[in-house]
Amino acid sequence: GLLERVEKSQVTVDKAEKQTLEFVSKWADKNSATLCGNSIWVDRRFLHKEMPTLDKYLHYRMIDVSSFKEVVERWYPETLRAPTKKQSHLAMDDIKESLEELRWYRENIFRQENTTS
């Protein structure tokens, strides 16, 4: 599982931070890249402690997709449920699934009604 992959990895925390910064900086300026995902407060605390340069590069605001889930379940309990996740706990799968879930909320909950004046 995950622990085995971590133990076998040759990528140090410093190297991972550098690679991530290189990637993020290609797509977003400093203080404009928003951390997004499910239950990301622990992720942000990890970045603050272990990857401070990356943490400072990111915008201080975050989009926690799990907050959308909590609001929708309480405000619109009759609404269709968001897509289920594989729970593979692989970073790329988690990222894609979080984006898919956020897209689902946009298309099914936060859609703009057609109005004419």
Walk through the language-model features, giving the residues of each:
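Conserved non-catalytic scaffold segment of RNase H-like nuclease domains
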Residues: 1-37, 83
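Short, contiguous clusters of charged residues that form electrostatic/catalytic patches at enzyme active sites
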Residues: 15-18, 22, 70, 93-96, ...
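Tryptophan-centric aromatic hotspots in well-structured domains and transmembrane helices
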Residues: 23, 58-60, 75, 104-105
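Acidic, Mg2+-coordinating catalytic module of metal-dependent nucleases/exonucleases
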Residues: 31-41, 45-51, 77-117
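Short, low-complexity, polybasic intrinsically disordered segments
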Residues: 47-63
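Short, flexible loop segments at boundaries between secondary-structure elements
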Residues: 59-77
